[in-house]
């Protein structure tokens, strides 16, 4: 992954991802907790990203060492 954006389905996180897309970056792992929120789902659908992980799944993957270190991490999750 070139970038990980936590909170990437929210207003600020999705706009950070759109800026990354405009700079040619689409190898983005988006991490969030959608909870069935249609607005967040719409935000997530509005930009290119390589993968999406739910917050708890991401935490478990980090603890298990299954997440490749990104070039950049934008921590915008609450």
What annotation goes with each model-predicted range?
Residues 1-78:
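N-terminal Rossmann-like NAD(P)+-binding domain of SDR-like oxidoreductases, especially those catalyzing
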């Amino acid at each position: 992954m070139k970038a990980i954006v936590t909170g990437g389905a929210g207003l600020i996180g999705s706009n950070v991802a759109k800026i990354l897309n405009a700079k040619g970056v689409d190898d983005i792992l988006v991490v969030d907790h959608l909870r069935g929120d249609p607005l967040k789902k719409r935000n997530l659908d509005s930009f290119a990203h390589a993968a999406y992980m739910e917050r708890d799944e991401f935490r478990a993957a980090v603890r298990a060492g299954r997440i490749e270190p990104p070039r950049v991490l934008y921590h915008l999750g609450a």
